[in-house]
Amino acid sequence: MYAIIETGGKQYMVREGDVLVVEKLNYPEGEVISFDKILAVSKEDGNVEFGKPYLENVKVNAKIIEHGKGPKIRVFKYKPKKNYRRRQGHRQPYTKVQIEKIVQ
């Protein structure tokens, strides 16, 4: 059984027990959260139910494992003959979650 959830402006196909890296969520580590924006869910008999746009009465429970930062992205601007150089770095924060249960 799987579900398609939406979080952080992206969509993820998840199963129970999956470990997922999503955009940063403002919850402490170890807390159990619930995703309620469910786009689709498969039933035990193989049928798939789709929402318009989201399904009612379906939730996905997940536990927050850790928070972190992704690899450093370096942005370099350069204009020739003008002595213009700008270097900037960025590390995108993320949250790692483990899917515990798909509740229907």
Curated annotation (Swiss-Prot):
The keyword RNA-binding applies. InterPro entries: bL21-like, bL21-like_sf, Ribosomal_bL21, Ribosomal_bL21_CS. It holds the Pfam family Ribosomal_L21p. GO terms for biological process: translation. This protein binds to 23S rRNA in the presence of protein L20. Belongs to the bacterial ribosomal protein bL21 family. This is Large ribosomal subunit protein bL21. The gene is rplU.
